[in-house]
Amino acid sequence: MRTYAPAATETVLRRLLEEPSLAHAVTHHAVLPAREAITAPFPAWLDRRIVRGLEDRGITSLYSHQAEAVEAVHAGEDIVVVTPTASGKTLCYALPVLQALAEDPSARALFLFPTKALGQDQVAEFAGLARASSLDVAAATYDGDTPAPIRSAIRTAGQVVVTNPDMLHSAILPHHTKWFQLFEQVQVIVIDELHTYRGVFGSHVANVLRRVLRLCAHYGSSPIIVCSSATIGNPAELAAQLTGRAPRLIDRNGAPAGARHVLLVDPPLLDQATGARGSALTHAERWALPFLRAGRQTIVFGRARVAVEIILTRLREALREHLGPRSRIRGYRGGYLPTERRAIERGLRDGEILGVVSTNALELGVDIGALDVSILAGYPGSIAATWQQLGRAGRRQETSVGVLIASGSPVDQYVIHHPEFLLEGSPEEARIDPNNLHVLLAHLRCATFERPFEPGEVFGPGPVDDLLAFIGEEGHVRQSGDGRWYWSSENFPASEVSLRTAAPENVVIIDTTPDRPRVIGETDLFSAQVLVHTQAIYLHDSQQYHVDKLDWGERKAYVRKVDVDYYTYANRAVTLKPLDVFASEPATGGRRVHGEVMVASLVTLFKKLKFGTDENVGWGPIDLPELELQTTAYWLTYDEADGTAIPADRGVDRSGGSARVLRRTLAEPPPGRPALDRPDGSGSPPNKWRKDDLDVALLGAGRAIQAVAAVLLMVDPRDLGLVTQVRSPHSEAPTIYLYEAVPGGIGLSERLFKRHEELITGARALIQACPCDAGCPACTGPRLDPEVNGKSLALRLLAALDSRDARGAKHQATRAESVPA
């Protein structure tokens, strides 16, 4: 076995940047300077046992944000702490809770973490601090893995209960009478990783917390709420929406940090005509190997289990001669046994494991010690997640390196060519809508089961008597003579509500791989048609499953574990009809609108696409009924397509992959048609469009707008459906719709309406920055006709919608009028 002498991280980076093939792919290289610690003494009121416990661990003072947080909680304030990874947020809530227990052993605390693994890690950290402080504290996790005998002990004697929102919703709140010690004595509720509670999940969790606080009030307690979050654009607003409180924002970080190199890498274009790029996985391997050979602890993040396994296999093979035991390079993902995960985490902390390849399972705050390099094979989907993953390196006051390698997706390409999104603060905001009618009704049923509602009682936005009367018509609740509302059904409402979906009816996903089938998840009906149709490849906790059968009538999908090199994409034909307009304003080249829409969806066939290349390796039919989704949407109309005799159409779904394009009405271009191959989309009279060209332009521009919207709102692109209509029956103009893929919507479309100009300029910049010739999957989507320049057509349309161009044209016209004849 060959060995290499350890080299400094910066030395290895310098060598890498001297390699032309790697250096040329770097689109941006920033160095974030080292930061000195800002400290404060321990509060005078902090119990001496806790102070000694901290000092025994080498902690002789607090960082400034820790001191501010513990003082605020001690004064009875709700807080939200927003500081980077490895800045010591745990002490912000651990110290106030330990102090409360030191003063009153009958006190209780409830810790909420988004995942079981994180909860188990944090309870171990908290228990260790309690032992160091010579405090006998009963802290335990209460999750799906907790044995029944231990559950009973936690209910009666647990001083610190660590759980997740799903268990709180389904196993604690419905049985609150068994938890009366917790609800009577709870002094602090901790909500960690606040930024993960967004979208539908966050909307559900907000209602779970409404139920928690309702029961606390019933039992006579009024706990302080402590939230912690990664950097997002609206942490105080999100915390307020989740908790119904107005927390104090603590975001001045006092923790030290070493210098950090941040590199954005765009694999080179392999085919300018098709837009095919080098693999992000291959480039992740090329960047990781030199650091590993130099003895630098490195983590590589892949976006899916298959990506993790590919990178892991390649690294082990390449390093076999140099490192010997394969155990020094490990994988980490959902599906590993808890004991195996703990061993990997311990090996990383101790330095026995040199490299790890992980899904986002290691993104959250599980303690893995101090790493030197973090490499991301693909944009994780949000800026918050990006910094969480990059922050896995640099936990000591030493120089670290973070590398983000883009895939060919439009979102990745937008981020990689706009470094300001990562380096100049977060533009993205986590959005939830706790008052979404579907979500609110679901939790109102659960809350009524937990205890009766008084006449005029408020739950969320206001009194809920009318909503309870509606539920009463279903036969689930009844009103007594004194006006109180009681649960009257034999159903157990919490078991019928998934925190991960908003639809009132779901498809249960059953894993038939083991001897005893087990439920591994569920999904709403609208998503089920594309995620778990028969023969689909379904991903759960980074594990691939083949859907053997979707029983639509029984609402059950039967799956089994597989390991394949392809994924499935379902073509969804969508028709859309506006129902109501909430807001409508003039915009450059047309109008921007926010309103309610009815979306009808019909899934007809699926494709098998190879990972990495998206090569089509097969297809099959899908036989499922049409579904309707009533939701909210943002749309924009283009009102300058004069002289284009276009019949009204109902549109088709454009939400990703290959989409069905409207039937062409003109097979050949008319004589003398001007070329449309200039990069700026010029070359044709500004207001003259052929129907086919306009269809392509709307589709290309819409895909780019959808990608930019996902970046700005910090959502998965699949959360927003795309429909384009060459002539909308509603507006009688060419229209691009972005609708929320959630019944009733959760507020995303309203935000898009307000950020209309950013969407247009961002989409235009995304397409202009792409080096392809005529459109590709990284900007306007796959080229469906090699003879049509979709890139120039989309740019021509976006230029007509861009207020900057309108202002420039107006300025030029004014100048022309002022020139003497």
What are these regions (language model features)?
Residues 17-57, 61, 68, 74-75, ...:
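Helicase motor core with emphasis on the C-terminal RecA-like subdomain
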Residues 60, 102-106, 287, 764, ...:
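ASCE P-loop NTPase motor cores of helicases and related translocases
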Residues 92-93:
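Hydrophobic positions on the alpha1 helix immediately C-terminal to the Walker A/P-loop
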Residues 399-402, 408-422, 440-455, 464, ...:
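Extended Lys/Arg-rich polyanion-binding regions
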Residues 656-673, 683-685, 807-809, 813:
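N-terminal amphipathic/hydrophobic targeting modules at extreme N-termini
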Residues 770, 775-779:
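Short cysteine clusters
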Residues 800-811, 821:
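Short Fe-S-cluster ligation motifs
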